[in-house]
């Protein structure tokens, strides 16, 4: 019986850690398409992707380092 609070606490910490996102990112259980530098015209199907951290709505994913940045900060191709 003494292990129950410890197990609950451990599960809570693990669940919280999974949803910590990087700068300019947010967690979504049902993310749509994520904007990427240089691919702003790419079509986006209206369906859920896998749950994950994705760039905030006004941010673009910079490749290759994966940071989320404003569109104006995207490298020019």
From Swiss-Prot:
Residues 1-17 form the signal peptide. The keyword Disulfide bond applies. The record marks 46-47 as: Reactive bond. It comes from the Eukaryota. Gene3D superfamilies: Laminin. It is found in: Secreted. The keyword Glycoprotein does not apply. Residues 21-74 form the TIL domain. Keywords: Disulfide bond, Protease inhibitor, Secreted, Serine protease inhibitor, Signal. GO terms for molecular function: serine-type endopeptidase inhibitor activity. Disulfide bonds join 21-53, 30-48, 33-44, 37-74, 55-68. Defends the organism against the host's proteinases. This is Serine protease inhibitor 1. It comes from Anisakis simplex (Herring worm).
């Amino acid at each position: 019986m003494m292990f129950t609070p410890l197990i609950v606490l451990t599960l809570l910490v693990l669940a919280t850690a999974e949803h910590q996102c990087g700068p300019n990112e947010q967690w979504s259980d049902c993310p749509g398409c994520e904007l990427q530098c240089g691919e702003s015209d790419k079509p986006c199907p209206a369906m859920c992707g896998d749950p994950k951290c994705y760039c905030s709505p006004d941010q673009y994913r910079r490749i290759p380092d994966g940071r989320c940045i404003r569109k104006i900060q995207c490298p020019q191709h």
